[in-house]
Amino acid sequence: MANAIIEKANQRFEQSFQSLSREYASIRAGRANASLLDRIQVEYYGVPTPLNQLASITVPEARVLLISPFDKSSIKDIERAINASDLGITPANDGSVIRLVIPALTEETRKELAKEVKKVGENQKIAIRNIRRDAMDEAKKQEKNKEITEDELKALEKDIQKATDQAIKHIDGMTSEKEKELLTV
């Protein structure tokens, strides 16, 4: 029973790490990366559709993304969705493909993005602490129902805290790595 609580918490921690990775991948660092476009939804025949399902996205050069729509008639919709997004990149449409030239980041933009990275990391740490709280509540409930002893509860709480500390340390590492990537010119 006790191991099941820690196992469940660890699975939720892992989901948080994956979520944070996806979030960080979508924050542009001055280099072209197809995951920048992951959050873009295109209005395609009245249905919001992820861009990566409507087109192939390639990186021909370090700061260029090339979007090749599978259906050429959707090119205007894709262009409209990119313009409406918060990317701050203007698409260049040549009729069959869309080019996105990623501008070099200014020092000010880098610092703003670093703040955003910190904020996202903090939100993820809050999620980790909520997972810890849920695990602790579950352990206390088991102790109250006499499924585990008070000593087992203390040991379990200690293990949960240790796992939480490791998860927060991992998030701190991911955050500082992304900040370093952003602030490197």
Swiss-Prot record:
One of its GO terms (biological process) is translational termination. Keywords: Cytoplasm, Protein biosynthesis. One of its GO terms (molecular function) is ribosomal large subunit binding. GO terms for cellular component: cytoplasm. It comes from the Bacteria. It holds the Pfam family RRF. HAMAP family: RRF. This is Ribosome-recycling factor. It comes from Streptococcus uberis (strain ATCC BAA-854 / 0140J).
